[in-house]
Amino acid sequence: MFLAQEIIRKKRNAEALSKEEIQFFVKGITDNTVSEGQIAALGMAVYFNDMNMDERIALTTSMRDSGTVLDWQSLDLNGPIIDKHSTGGVGDVISLMLGPMAAACGGYVPMISGRGLGHTGGTLDKFDAIPGYQTEPDSALFRKVVKEAGVAIIGQTGDLVPADKRFYSIRDNTATVESISLITASILSKKLAAGLDALAMDVKVGSGAFMPTYEASEELARSITAVANGAGTKTTALLTDMNQVLASCAGNAVEVKEAIDFLTGRYRNPRLYEVTMGLCAEMLMLGGIASTETQAREKLNAVLDNGKAAEIFGRMISGLGGPTDFVENPGLYLPESKIIRPVYAEQTGFATSMDTRELGLAVVTLGGGRRKPGDALDYSVGLTQVCALGDEISKDKPIAMIHAQTETAFAEAERAVRKAIHIGDSRPEKTPEIYRYIRASDL
């Protein structure tokens, strides 16, 4: 029998906690036998004194096991359970293509996603733009769609990882969100509760990233790779660029449209293609579907070119309550804003840098994102045709199209976009889409 205050004292004194102590404390978070003050105190002690890898693994697995852990064995699936998680960005629409692409290659992708907050867009918000699509189906329907389509992208259900829900809300109120140990456990407990065989982790770097510096992003990527593999799930982290909007757009309905254009081959943004392929190829290799990156990319290009990935996306949409002809006719179903107009730069030259976070906040200003949890969204608004770094900017070439509902919102977004996209005299050096891979063998 342990005492919560003794566990807090130990961590306050920078000592390592045992697996049993961590399990006891997490059980207390879940069943309310540990108070809010005690949770806040442990969070602060961890923030200042950190946790070693064994502690991080124990915290992650204890939180994972605080609720239901999905088990797919009874479905007799003939492929690996694989998934991807992103730390979030602007125009990060990867999940919408990656899930169907991985499923088309023989994987099963039960993707449990989140909503957007602050400048980052949420995958679930994009699906909420599709009429009828259920982001919170019951367990039976979720399993049915995973089995039949190979992929289902839904929201976190109440019985998954209850410890994280309580711990995170307290961390949020007590300034202990930015601990690498606690971020690692929060992300991975939710992902690993989906019963995964393998995970590709997308850790963003740059002006639109969650972590403030490249070094912090790399530290998080290393922590996630070490802890996930230590918890028994094959995992690789990719450090990817978020110094500009990833897709050509940012918003909800507009990103769904870009995902369909990507899957059907109508238009594939080259940067979006590179990051999607990098993550998806890693999933196939970790899951044993491909033995080399070249082989994985060949498989992925094949399912894009033969239409199988697009077909699976359509099957998932209709399976979860959306229209049966959504891929063929997205324009019939996706909402459109009243005002769609270009914004021009006030000078000519080249797009040299972007404050990607500010572009994400411009979407929030338009009504397409949340300032606080629970805010209602306008799914039609956002930015499209956003210029890329290195693009030549002239007086008659828009730097973006703004989709707004009112003139006031348009004017505010126009100011924000102009301020966020910096124009200079010379073309900047091209930055890589993927900075590096961190695999278990690299640790």
Curated annotation (Swiss-Prot):
Catalytic activity: thymidine + phosphate = 2-deoxy-alpha-D-ribose 1-phosphate + thymine
A GO CC annotation given for this chain: cytosol
Top-level EC class: transferase
InterPro entries recorded: Glycosyl_Trfase_fam3, Glycosyl_Trfase_fam3_N_dom, Glycosyl_Trfase_fam3_N_dom_sf, Nuc_phospho_transferase, PYNP-like_C_sf, PYNP_C, Pyrmidine_PPas_bac/euk, Pyrmidine_PPase_CS
GO molecular function: 1,4-alpha-oligoglucan phosphorylase activity; thymidine phosphorylase activity
Highest taxon, organism lineage: Bacteria
UniProtKB keywords: Glycosyltransferase, Transferase
Pathway(s) where this gene product acts: Pyrimidine metabolism; dTMP biosynthesis via salvage pathway; dTMP from thymine: step 1/2
GO biological process, one term: pyrimidine nucleobase metabolic process
This enzyme's EC code(s): 2.4.2.4
Keyword Transferase attributed: yes
Family designation: Belongs to the thymidine/pyrimidine-nucleoside phosphorylase family.
Subunit structure: Homodimer.
Function: The enzymes which catalyze the reversible phosphorolysis of pyrimidine nucleosides are involved in the degradation of these compounds and in their utilization as carbon and energy sources, or in the rescue of pyrimidine bases for nucleotide synthesis.
Protein name as it appears in the record: Thymidine phosphorylase
